[in-house]
């Protein structure tokens, strides 16, 4: 019996089973122990293969691919710390709903806890973060192929969101010519090999039913809060709220067009919060809210009913409102709960939103990151998409901009880490094939700098804006100790990104004014390559501008 040949047949069953659940993209890191999985993936023509030398970036690349494709994405890594590097992407997927299938090669059991090289305790290492965890045995003909395929089908067939960890131990030898070893074992699956359906089909998950008292609540004074959702859902939510006559507070990720812009500014005005207190019901569609003032209002509001609609399971309400947690696809839920045409009941808030936007516009001429956040709509590529980083940049765009309704916006706002942002943006571009504008801060770019290697392979123009404010200026908005702020919080690095772009043969610009920025964009959108635009700004101007606008709008 050839161990290497049977390893490959075992792996081929695993990989073929994944195709029956919509897996098309597969991300592969280099490694020896993962050879059976890698070769099985290479031989399966269903897959689109992606490679990267850094497993942490590879996990985030898969995350970006899954965000756009809405399908599970598989990742193959070797044993040891390579597996641990997938943890951040797995955590993010669990919070934002992407489906990741982590195929982690492992040493066989007799090599664990005995000093063998690159052998760690991998089963269960991700704790409760995967939706399902499978610890496979070493490949053996004593276990029928139908057990292997049905085990995978059960995990993937019941997967609605998050990750599946499939730990795959393989004994040596890992290399060798293929022979007939295990062929009869594999063939016992019969015509499954010619089919395209799972071996084991699971019943679909039950979703929340229609709320039978909706006809009653839609006649009340309501507020719609829109969190993260798809572009198509964002347009539908905007129309739904408009028909009801309810104010819509739209997050930067809602893609609703934010009909009441600058919410994070006007929610700091007592007139606005006083008017919102009249609401009898709040319907929150989507989770992962960004704005600080929005979260503060959400925590303090006490309507008669607070409904949260999202297809991700879990409470999704850090304020623990009394109400209803409705698990449903947002578009489907809107169809079951149609709006009834009513006149708007809020009078003060539309006026405050308009005045807040005018206050922002009055400051748009200075060359800074707050002004860039406001102007970002001017630079969006046609038929393209936006990827927004974390920390200060996403808060500024949320507070100061008004993104077009239905324009695709992506981010990592589950755990909201700054790790893996460039890798995720690369995945977003690859899965969509669209022109992409990505914007991150300087520390985020440094954190994932080797992901610039992934940005060499794009199918449409990609512009990466690095807002260089020399450190983590988000901490300027927090009551961090002034005496220790720079050393322990901001951590300025005093670097520029010209040489990093050159190392990966990417185009680079460092504009000094708006005209130069517009020229850089015009050049970047002409060719299907990546352009790094570094916008060097004064350290604290962005945070100070936001604070000044908050103070100004609070007194309107």
Swiss-Prot record:
Pathway: Quinol/quinone metabolism; 1,4-dihydroxy-2-naphthoate biosynthesis; 1,4-dihydroxy-2-naphthoate from chorismate: step 2/7; Quinol/quinone metabolism; menaquinone biosynthesis. It catalyses: isochorismate + 2-oxoglutarate + H(+) = 5-enolpyruvoyl-6-hydroxy-2-succinyl-cyclohex-3-ene-1-carboxylate + CO2. Keywords: Magnesium, Manganese, Menaquinone biosynthesis, Metal-binding, Thiamine pyrophosphate, Transferase. One of its GO terms (molecular function) is magnesium ion binding. Binds 1 thiamine pyrophosphate per subunit. It comes from the Bacteria. Its cofactor is Mg(2+); Mn(2+); thiamine diphosphate. Its EC number is 2.2.1.9. It is an enzyme of class 2 (transferase). One of its GO terms (biological process) is menaquinone biosynthetic process. It holds the Pfam family TPP_enzyme_N. The keyword Transferase applies. InterPro entries: MenaQ_synth_MenD (IPR004433), MenD_middle (IPR032264), THDP-binding (IPR029061), Thiamin_PyroP_enz_TPP-bd_dom (IPR012001), TPP_enzyme_TPP-bd (IPR011766). Catalyzes the thiamine diphosphate-dependent decarboxylation of 2-oxoglutarate and the subsequent addition of the resulting succinic semialdehyde-thiamine pyrophosphate anion to isochorismate to yield 2-succinyl-5-enolpyruvyl-6-hydroxy-3-cyclohexene-1-carboxylate (SEPHCHC). PANTHER family: 2-SUCCINYL-5-ENOLPYRUVYL-6-HYDROXY-3-CYCLOHEXENE-1-CARBOXYLATE SYNTHASE, PROTEIN PHYLLO, CHLOROPLASTIC. Homodimer. Belongs to the TPP enzyme family. MenD subfamily. HAMAP family: MenD. This is 2-succinyl-5-enolpyruvyl-6-hydroxy-3-cyclohexene-1-carboxylate synthase. It comes from Escherichia coli (strain 55989 / EAEC).
């Amino acid at each position: 019996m050839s161990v290497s040949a049977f390893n490959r047949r075992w792996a081929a069953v695993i990989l073929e089973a994944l195709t029956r659940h919509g897996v098309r993209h597969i991300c592969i890191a280099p490694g020896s122990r993962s050879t059976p999985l890698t070769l099985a993936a290479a031989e399966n023509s269903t897959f689109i293969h992606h490679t990267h030398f850094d497993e942490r970036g590879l996990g985030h690349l898969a995350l970006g691919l899954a965000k756009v494709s809405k399908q599970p994405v598989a990742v193959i890594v070797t044993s040891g710390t390579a597996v641990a590097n997938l943890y951040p992407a797995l955590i993010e997927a669990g919070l934002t709903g992407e489906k990741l299938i982590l195929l982690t090669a492992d040493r066989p059991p007799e090599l664990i806890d005995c000093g063998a090289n690159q052998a760690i305790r991998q089963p269960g290492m991700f704790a409760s973060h995967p939706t399902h965890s499978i610890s496979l045995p070493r490949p053996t003909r004593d276990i029928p192929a139908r057990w292997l395929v049905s085990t995978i089908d059960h995990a993937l067939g019941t997967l609605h969101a998050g990750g599946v960890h499939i730990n795959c131990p393989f004994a040596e030898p890992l290399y060798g010519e293929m022979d007939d070893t295990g062929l009869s074992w594999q063939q016992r699956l019969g015509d499954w090999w010619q089919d395209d359906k799972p071996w084991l089909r699971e019943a679909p998950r039950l979703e929340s039913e229609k709320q039978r008292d909706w006809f009653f609540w839609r006649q009340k004074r309501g507020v719609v809060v829109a969190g993260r959702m798809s572009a198509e859902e964002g347009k539908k939510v905007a129309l739904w709220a408009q028909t009801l006559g309810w104010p819509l507070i739209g997050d930067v990720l809602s893609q609703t067009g934010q009909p009441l812009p600058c919410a994070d500014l006007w929610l700091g005005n007592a007139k606005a919060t006083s008017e919102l207190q009249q609401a009898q019901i709040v319907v929150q569609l989507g989770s992962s809210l960004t704005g600080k003032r929005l979260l503060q209002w959400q925590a303090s509001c006490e309507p008669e009913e607070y409904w949260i609609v999202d297809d991700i399971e879990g409470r999704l309400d850090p304020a623990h409102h009394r109400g209803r947690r409705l698990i449903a696809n947002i578009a489907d839920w809107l169809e079951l709960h149609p709006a009834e045409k009513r006149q708007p009941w809020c009078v003060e808030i539309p006026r405050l939103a308009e005045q807040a936007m005018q206050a922002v516009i009055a400051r748009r001429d200075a060359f800074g990151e707050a002004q860039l956040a406001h102007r970002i709509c001017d630079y969006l590529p046609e038929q393209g998409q936006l990827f927004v980083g974390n920390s200060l940049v996403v808060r500024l765009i949320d507070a100061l901009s008004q993104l077009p309704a239905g324009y695709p916006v992506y981010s990592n706002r589950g755990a909201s880490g700054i790790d893996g942002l460039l890798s995720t943006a690369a995945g977003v571009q690859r899965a969509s094939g669209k022109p992409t504008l990505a914007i991150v801060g300087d520390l985020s770019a440094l954190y994932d700098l080797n992901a610039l290697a992934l940005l060499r392979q794009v199918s449409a123009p990609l512009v990466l804006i690095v807002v260089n404010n020399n450190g983590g200026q988000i901490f300027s908005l927090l009551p961090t100790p002034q005496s220790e702020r720079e050393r322990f919080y901001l951590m300025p690095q005093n670097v520029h990104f010209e040489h990093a772009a050159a190392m990966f043969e990417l185009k680079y610009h460092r504009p000094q004014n708006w005209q130069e920025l517009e020229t850089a964009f015009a050049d970047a959108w002409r060719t299907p390559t990546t352009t790094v635009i570094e916008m060097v700004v004064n350290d604290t101007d962005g945070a100070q501008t936001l604070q000044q606008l908050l103070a100004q709008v609070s007194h309107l």
